[in-house]
Amino acid sequence: MASSTCYATIPAMSCRGQSTITRFGPNNLFLGKQSYELPLMRRNAKFTVRSMREDNEKEEQQQQKQQQTHDGGPDLTPNRTEVTTKRTVDLFSFDGLAPERINGRSAMIGFVAAVGVELATGRDVFSQVFNGGVMWFLLTSAVLVLATLIPIYRGLSPEAKNNGFWNSDAEIWNGRFAMIGLVALAFTEYVKGGPLINV
């Protein structure tokens, strides 16, 4: 009679088996009576898992805020859309709030200024840039960067004032068209070799 005992590395898992040899069969195959016992694995349920969607939390916060305003009177705080991040690195990342807005605002001002100066003096975009335009570009860019970042650092997002004709979507699309228009104006004047509008 042979007996064997094995223990695994996982706690609470062990096996004990007993094997009784009864005979050898043809071709020397082992035939025997085997019995193995495995204890029940018990779960250690000392913790609970809770999963919630963020939407539910936001809805609950809005409901609580509405209940407070109904109970205590009108809400006098300004309507602010919360900005989740205020790190400058995150704001200037590829999908951040700042890059497209700053570039769009610069392009809108730049396009209007380039066409206005061209109509007034007859100089093309390149002569405007090389004759004092770089200083104006740097000054305007600094003002636009500050004008874009200060409200974001104060907790306002561009979508906070989305009512009426002036909204953030219109600003984004106007900025995109101005970027395309400014590049097209410079390219056309480069190919033509002079100002687009001759005065």
From Swiss-Prot:
A single GO cellular-component term on record: chloroplast thylakoid membrane
Expression (tissue specificity): Preferentially localized in the chloroplast-rich palisade parenchyma cells, in extracts of desiccated leaves, in seeds, but not in roots or untreated leaves.
Pfam families: Chloroa_b-bind
Keywords: Chloroplast, Membrane, Plastid, Thylakoid, Transit peptide, Transmembrane, Transmembrane helix
Location of the region described as Disordered in the Swiss-Prot/TrEMBL record: 53-82
Subcellular location: Plastid, Chloroplast thylakoid membrane
Transit peptide as recorded in UniProt: 1-52
Membrane topology (UniProt): Multi-pass membrane protein
Membrane spanning stretches: 130-152, 172-191
Chain's role: Possibly exerts a protective role during water loss.
Family: Belongs to the ELIP/psbS family.
Name of the protein in its database record: Desiccation stress protein DSP-22, chloroplastic
Gene giving rise to this polypeptide: DSP-22
